[in-house]
């Protein structure tokens, strides 16, 4: 067999395939916004999406069920229209309260623009049932990357009887002043439900608020916690 002549100058360097996804084009600037109605900070809705969301598929399996605790029945009935209106008109979801199962059920409708609205609607209802005001929980529908983190006092330190009551008192402060200060500095919302604590906000802000709450539970004086919070908040504002 005759050897075939190979021209070395005819070869071109191989092209490296570009990676798809968020890591391919470097870091993207995330636009943060403080909701004027609630003061909660989060990512601007739609700022992380490169294109318009696809039309949601109509499927009966796309359903979310949120159990209603017994002590929130009356509050749910009282504020039902405030919950129903944004979920149906803005999220374009179908919602109902199943009286027999004691659950709020949400389902994708024919006009739902984004399948992610179903999870956000369920998070909104779940936040209200945790004890947040409707206006505060609405931030979950207005802004992206907001979460509700829940934990108990015993997760931080085992306290019983009067010791636990004093810890709850330190968290609230006189007239709720300590809780309001932590909320304003960290741009979050906090609910003290007996021994359970719920924090609504962005991931970074939740960590700040949780650190302050844990320090108070462990016995740190409020003045020291305020100082640490303001120092961290000022450093974060300089970075932004």
Curated annotation (Swiss-Prot):
Superkingdom classification of source: Eukaryota
Sequence ranges of Basic and acidic residues compositional bias: 1-15
Listed GO CC annotations: nucleolus; nucleus
InterPro entries in UniProt: KH-I_PNO1_first, KH_dom, KH_dom_type_1_sf, KH_PNO1_2nd
Entry keyword RNA-binding: yes
Molecular function per GO: RNA binding
Location in the cell: Nucleus, Nucleolus
CDD domains, per database record: KH-I_PNO1_rpt1 (cd22391), KH-I_PNO1_rpt2 (cd22392)
Predominant cellular place of this UniProt entry's protein: nucleus
Protein keywords: Nucleus, RNA-binding
Pfam families, alphabetized: KH_PNO1_2nd
Domain KH: 164-213
Region annotation (Disordered) ranges: 1-61
Keyword Nucleus: yes
UniProt xrefs under PANTHER family: RIBONUCLEASE Y, RNA-BINDING PROTEIN PNO1
Family: Belongs to the PNO1 family.
Protein name: RNA-binding protein pno1
Gene: l(1)G0004
């Amino acid at each position: 067999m005759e050897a075939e002549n190979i021209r070395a100058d005819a070869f071109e360097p191989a092209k490296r395939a570009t990676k798809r996804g968020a890591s391919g084009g470097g870091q993207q600037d995330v636009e943060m916004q403080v909701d004027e109605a609630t003061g909660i900070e989060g990512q601007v809705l739609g700022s992380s999406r490169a294109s318009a969301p696809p039309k949601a598929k109509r499927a009966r399996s796309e359903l979310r069920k949120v159990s209603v605790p017994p002590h929130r029945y009356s509050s749910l009935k009282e504020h039902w229209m405030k919950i129903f209106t944004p979920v149906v008109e803005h999220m374009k979801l179908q919602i109902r309260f199943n009286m027999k199962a004691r659950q709020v059920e949400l389902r994708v409708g024919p006009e739902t623009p984004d399948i992610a609205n179903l999870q956000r609607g369920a998070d909104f209802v779940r936040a209200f049932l945790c004890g947040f005001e409707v206006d505060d929980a609405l931030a979950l529908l207005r802004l992206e990357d907001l979460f509700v983190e829940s934990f108990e006092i015993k997760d931080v330190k085992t306290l019983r009887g009067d010791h636990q009551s004093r810890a709850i008192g330190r968290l609230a402060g006189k007239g709720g002043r300590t809780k309001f200060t932590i909320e304003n500095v960290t741009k979050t919302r906090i609910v003290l439900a007996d021994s359970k604590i719920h924090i609504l906000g962005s991931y970074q802000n939740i960590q700040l608020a949780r650190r302050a709450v844990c320090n108070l539970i462990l016995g740190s004086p409020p003045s020291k916690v305020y100082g640490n919070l303001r120092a961290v908040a000022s450093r974060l504002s300089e970075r932004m």
